[in-house]
């Protein structure tokens, strides 16, 4: 199913998925883990594209240090403001992801906290 999410929602979803999958204290069944990994794979290109744009903007508005690492100096508020404006445009833009929505019975009563369930909410459907 195709669903539209803002890039910032995709980033948040990726964080929740990664946290659930990597947390040894959360015991989820193998099928749910498989489904969550598949969803992560489906949004991977959007995460990578965001990182590319963000890094390009850091290089554009920032300066490199002696190690060749770019950063935007707080001494240059104009550059930081332009960077934030550019990144906000990307974060607020919509992307389409094609996934099979999670069914409520796949995630409820599976040991996931309410915080995790809230993070998964955009991809839980009937």
Positions of the model-derived regions?
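A composition-driven surface/loop motif
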Residues: 1-126
């Amino acid at each position: 199913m195709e669903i539209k999410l803002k890039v910032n929602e995709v980033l948040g979803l990726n964080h929740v998925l990664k946290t659930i999958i990597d947390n040894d204290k959360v015991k989820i069944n193998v099928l749910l883990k498989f489904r969550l990994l598949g969803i992560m794979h489906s949004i991977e290109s959007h995460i990578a594209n965001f990182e590319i744009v963000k890094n390009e903007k850091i290089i554009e508005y920032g300066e490199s240090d002696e190690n060749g690492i770019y950063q935007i100096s707080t001494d240059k508020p104009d550059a930081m403001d332009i960077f934030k404006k550019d990144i906000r445009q990307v974060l607020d833009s919509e992307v389409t992801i094609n996934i099979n929505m999670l069914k409520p019975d796949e995630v409820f009563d599976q040991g996931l906290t309410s915080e995790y369930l809230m993070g998964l909410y955009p991809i839980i459907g009937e």
